[in-house]
């Protein structure tokens, strides 16, 4: 019995004008996900996905390259305006935001959605270097 040929699904070009850019800047990596208003992912990128390894993932330059890549993919779908939600304490927050603006997106609002505990879990021990 012949094996059925696997069909390659082409990524259909959605025409979405505005969306939300979620920038998650942790201490070790920076992830950028661009979604539509409902939260469906349009494009994503991260410093690790752009080929940075180890401690280079946490640099502002790696966040800038990842944001440019995610922005380029989103622009292919016709996206022009973005709301930006920044989360996390990492060093790539501002550089990712600047890269999205430099990529030609109109940033309508910037929100910091970093979760702050009202004295929740016990924090990890202090580093002694």
UniProtKB/Swiss-Prot annotation:
GO terms for molecular function: rRNA binding; structural constituent of ribosome. Keywords: Ribonucleoprotein, Ribosomal protein, RNA-binding, rRNA-binding. Pfam families: Ribosomal_S11. GO terms for cellular component: ribonucleoprotein complex; ribosome. The keyword NAD does not apply. One of its GO terms (biological process) is translation. It comes from the Bacteria. NCBIfam families: PRK05309.1, uS11_bact. Located on the platform of the 30S subunit, it bridges several disparate RNA helices of the 16S rRNA. Forms part of the Shine-Dalgarno cleft in the 70S ribosome. Belongs to the universal ribosomal protein uS11 family. Part of the 30S ribosomal subunit. Interacts with proteins S7 and S18. Binds to IF-3. HAMAP family: Ribosomal_uS11. This is Small ribosomal subunit protein uS11. It comes from Methylobacterium nodulans (strain LMG 21967 / CNCM I-2342 / ORS 2060). The gene is rpsK.
């Amino acid at each position: 019995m012949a094996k059925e040929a696997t069909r390659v699904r082409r990524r259909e070009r959605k025409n979405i004008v505005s969306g939300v850019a979620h920038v998650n800047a942790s201490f070790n990596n920076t992830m950028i996900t661009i979604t539509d208003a409902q939260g469906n992912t349009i494009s994503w990128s991260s410093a690790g996905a752009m080929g940075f390894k180890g401690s280079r993932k946490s640099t502002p330059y790696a966040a800038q390259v990842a944001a440019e890549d995610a922005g380029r993919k989103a622009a292919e779908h016709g996206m022009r305006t973005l709301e930006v939600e920044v989360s996390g304490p990492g060093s790539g927050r501002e550089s990712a935001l600047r890269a999205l603006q430099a990529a030609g997106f109109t940033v309508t609002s910037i929100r910091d959605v970093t979760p702050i505990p009202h004295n929740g879990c016990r924090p990890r021990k202090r580093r002694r270097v």
